[in-house]
Regions:
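Conserved beta-propeller blade signature
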Residues: 42-44, 98-100, 156-158, 213-215, ...
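Blade-level signature of beta-propeller repeat domains, shared across WD40, Kelch, NHL, RCC1
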Residues: 315-342
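Residue-level detector of Asp-centered blade-edge/turn motifs that repeat once per structural unit
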Residues: 37-40, 93-96, 150-154, 208-211, ...
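A short loop-to-beta-strand structural motif that recurs across blades of beta-propeller domains
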Residues: 51-54, 107-111, 118, 165-169, ...
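Bacterial N-terminal signal peptides
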Residues: 7-15
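Gly/Pro-rich loop segments of beta-rich domains
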Residues: 20-31, 44, 61-87, 117-144, ...
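Short loop/turn segments immediately following the C-termini of beta-strands
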Residues: 48, 104, 162, 172, ...
Length: 342
């Protein structure tokens, strides 16, 4: 075969290959809900169903970092490996290099010193209630902390207090907690109003972009809200009715169904784990549109090795960006973590 013909065939072959493909980053997990990385490239995974935190080191070795696997609240002040957790939904490596864990059903946030391995409680008494604004977060009560975020300056820990229907923030310097969104009542907030005076449906997840905009994802509200630097709240995505529609168009005309997690990329786009539609979607604040990133919309486990729009997911509870800029998905009910490679 002439070299020119061979080159043409090879070029056609490359065109048929997916520009992106989905690979398995980690498996053998019990309902992974969240993942984050330290500066060295080690990954930490919150296993909601396993009541533990797993470590995936940069060499690819997987081990248990924290949690005995039994539900409970114990071990503060001691080794994280001997501590008990209860349904941890989220985690993040903080600006101080320590690992912060939303210990959801223990109604608190705990911190693991990654150098010493010691775990301590930084927010929440463990009691499910609402109290403590204006005082130390460690003495305050929360109604299930489902998600956490840090502000761009690394000064505040922002917490999603779902059953209290509030977003609360703790100063990392003073430890004092305050409400930044939600008045405790159930309902849809009015656009342009002070976020602290408005109701929320059920704030399930929170993220903060590089400008300090606080994004709130509502599970049963099927919507994404944004709190700007002035403290005003607006709905930016979702009709409020559950469904799967609107990809490629205005986000306010799109439907989501029980979304559970969100994160912001370097361009301040918002990734959304649209859990009950088994998809990952992206909201762009620049043009107000929403697009599908991964998932067919069908519950399943097929399609690994292929294009993101052909992979089947099963109730994903996490969507985030790894240090290289790749999208990583917590494919929870398939008990695995996926990575979209270019």
């Amino acid at each position: 075969m002439p070299s020119s013909a061979a080159a043409t065939l090879f070029a056609l072959f490359l065109m048929l290959l997916p520009a992106e493909k989905v690979t398995i980053l980690a498996g053998d997990l019990k309902e992974p809900f969240a993942i984050d990385w330290d500066k060295a490239g080690n990954a930490y995974i919150a296993e909601m169903g396993g009541n533990r935190i797993s470590l995936l080191d940069k060499a690819g070795k997987q081990s248990v970092l924290a949690g005995t696997g039994e539900k409970g609240l114990s071990g503060d002040g001691g080794a994280a490996a001997k501590a008990q957790f209860n349904g941890p939904h989220h985690l993040l490596v903080g600006p101080d290099g320590d690992l912060y864990v939303a210990d959801t059903f223990n109604n608190c946030v705990r911190k693991i010193d990654l150098k010493s391995g010691v775990v301590t409680r930084v927010a929440g008494t463990g009691k499910k209630a609402y109290s403590g604004d204006g005082g130390p977060a460690v003495s305050a009560d929360f109604g299930g902390i489902y998600c956490i975020a840090f502000d761009p300056k690394g000064e505040k820990l922002v917490m999603c207090d779902l059953d209290s229907r509030r977003i609360r923030a703790m100063s990392l310097k003073t430890g004092i907690v305050e409400t930044v969104a939600g008045n405790g009542q159930k309902g849809m907030p009015k656009n342009g109003e002070d976020a602290k005076t408005q109701p929320l449906v059920d704030p399930r997840a929170v993220a903060v972009d590089s400008k300090g905009t606080i994004y709130i994802l509502e599970r049963a509200g099927h919507a994404l809200r944004a709190v700007d630097a002035a403290g005003k709240i607006h709905t930016v995505a979702g009709t409020g009715k559950g469904g799967l529609s609107g990809d490629g168009g205005p986000a306010l005309q799109a439907q989501m169904n029980g979304p559970k997690h969100l994160s912001c990329d370097k361009e301040d786009n918002v990734l959304i784990a649209d859990t009950e539609t088994h998809t990952i979607r992206r909201y762009s604040p620049k043009d107000g549109k929403i697009t599908r990133v991964a998932g067919t919309g069908k519950k399943g486990s097929g399609g690994v090795g292929g294009a993101p729009d052909q992979v089947e997911l099963d109730r994903p509870h996490g969507a985030t960006i790894d240090p290289s800029g790749a999208i990583v998905i917590s494919d929870s009910e398939n008990h695995r973590v996926l990575r979209i490679e270019k």
